[in-house]
A protein has these predicted regions:
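Positively charged n-region of N-terminal signal peptides that target proteins for export
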Residues: 1-4
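Cleavable N-terminal signal peptides
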Residues: 8-10, 20
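N-terminal signal peptide c-region/cleavage motif recognized by signal peptidases
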Residues: 14-17
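Cross-family detector of peptidyl-prolyl cis-trans isomerase
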Residues: 20-23, 29, 64, 84
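Terminal helix/beta-alpha structural elements that buttress the NAD(P)+-binding lobe
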Residues: 25-26, 113, 127
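A short beta-strand-turn-helix
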Residues: 26-46, 67-72
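Short pre-active-site segment immediately N-terminal to redox-active cysteine/selenocysteine motifs
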Residues: 45, 52-55, 83-86
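Structural microenvironment flanking redox-active thiols in thiol-disulfide oxidoreductases
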Residues: 58-123
């Protein structure tokens, strides 16, 4: 898994500036559960930042993401689900998103508050 993670990371950062790479490794998100999610906690380990939406055709993938997180979290794998309404497919509040995910998918993986993932107002991670 380490070789695969390193390969994916190497491919994903090819052509990016040093500053952009620093943004990827040193970013934080406000948790939908309260507090902060710091990506530095997974330094040297694989992690996934994934844009999500509660009302899109792929919402059922929450269950798959949770299963992936459950399977590898003890090995140090990190994940942040990032809800965004940039595509008009998200519930109207963080509380609704949290409740929806907990009730329908029994989610306990790290999840940020609703963020912008595109354009000038995008979270720095998504601009990197």
């Amino acid at each position: 898994m380490k070789k695969l993670s390193a390969f994916i990371l190497a491919i994903s950062i090819c052509g990016y500036s040093t500053q952009a790479v620093a943004e990827i490794f040193n970013t934080s998100f406000t948790s939908i559960y309260g507090g902060k999610i710091e990506t530095q906690q997974w330094a040297g380990k694989p992690y996934l930042i994934v844009n999500t939406a509660s009302m899109c055709a792929f919402t059922r993938q929450y269950a798959t993401l949770q299963k992936l997180y459950d399977e590898y979290r003890e090995a140090g794998f990190g994940m942040v689900a990032v809800p965004s309404d940039d595509f008009n497919q998200e519930l109207s509040s963080n509380a609704e998103i949290k409740d929806f995910c907990e009730l329908n998918y029994d989610i306990d993986m790290p999840m940020s508050e609703t963020l912008s993932v595109k354009g000038l107002s995008a979270h720095p991670f998504f601009k990197a």
